[in-house]
Amino acid sequence: MQKVFIAPTHYKRIDEFLAKELQISKNQVLNLIKEGLVFCQKKEVKKGGLALKEGDAITLLTPKIVPKPLKKELDLEIEVIFEDEDLLVLNKPPNLVVHKAPSVKEPTLVDWLKSQNYELSNLGLKERYGIVHRLDKDTSGGIVIAKNNFTHVCLSEQLKTKMMGRYYIALLSTPLKEEKMSVECYLTRNPNNRLKMIALKAAKKEKSRYSKSEFTSLLTSQNGMDLIGAKLFTGRTHQIRAHLEYLNRHIIGDNLYGLNGVLSKEEIRIMLHAYLIEFKHPRSEQKLRFKVPLLKDMLEYLKKVFDKENLDEVLDEEKILHAFIAK
């Protein structure tokens, strides 16, 4: 398989162009060049500094990649929502990091994928094989995994152009001020707590990143808890949690962004779940939509808060999508 890009304008360096298109670092692009996978106008690219002219065709070969499996299978139960030759859709459990980082010592989702001998894309670092987008460690729900580089590039493109739809369910301690609210701002590390992100009220600052979310109230309990839907237009670290904090609202079970660190007397995890995901299949271009079931712990907690009949009604996927479309 291969993917072809057309340079829309002059570029001083091909590595800068591909880094932008593939949403990876220039070093990762250089690795692809070293492996003989990048061609410009049908000629193999040898250096990242190759200048591009408007209309140049850049071809990226996508060989079949089978990561070396781990010696020991990980004791994790992860539901596979969908699988074909190009991709996986998984229901990630909470308390599971997606990929390795310097501070991460425990097994990750990528470790599990390798232990199951899945073929995975390798456009990212080896710790991130297959990973097109991420979920926070404590967040459960739908995540798409690329089995090959062609799929990885196509899905990354859909993320970049906002063609991939991602919808979350969250339980708030208090209702939204309005039935529908949106946050559009820049996010950066909180200078007072490096574990947190903070929404900037002013313009963009160094190392901050643009972000946008929409929120809609789905169901309010008698004691004032609010089940909401959240739609992502970008996918920044802790985006939903930081945006809600900007609105002075907090998710039940979120000890990092919660009021005084605690929002519930019970020992529960954060009530945040990636519920719906939709995108075009990279090969067939068929539009796909997946409803990723709430995990048992979150569903049982919600049943304590809301009437089951009302809960089932608002969790209907068409109702959630309509809630964001309707004005």
From Swiss-Prot:
Enzyme Commission number(s) of this protein: 5.4.99.-
Gene Ontology annotations of biological process type: enzyme-directed rRNA pseudouridine synthesis
Residue ranges of domain S4 RNA-binding in the record: 12-79
Residues forming the catalytic site: 136
Keyword entries, A-Z: Isomerase, RNA-binding
Major enzyme class: isomerase
Isomerase as UniProt keyword: yes
GO molecular function: RNA binding; rRNA pseudouridine synthase activity
UniProt keyword RNA-binding, yes or no: yes
Catalysed reactions, as listed in the record: a uridine in RNA = a pseudouridine in RNA
Superkingdom, taxonomy of origin: Bacteria
InterPro entries membership: PsdUridine_synth_cat_dom_sf, PsdUridine_synth_RluA-like_CS, PsdUridine_synth_RluC/D, PsdUridine_synth_RsuA/RluA, RluA_PseudoU_synthase, S4_RNA-bd, S4_RNA-bd_sf
SUPFAM superfamilies with a match to the protein in the record: Alpha-L RNA-binding motif, Pseudouridine synthase
Family: Belongs to the pseudouridine synthase RluA family.
UniProt-listed PANTHER family: MITOCHONDRIAL RNA PSEUDOURIDINE SYNTHASE (PTHR21600), RIBOSOMAL LARGE SUBUNIT PSEUDOURIDINE SYNTHASE D (PTHR21600:SF44)
NCBIfam families listed in its UniProt record: rluA_subfam
Protein name as annotated: Uncharacterized RNA pseudouridine synthase jhp_0682
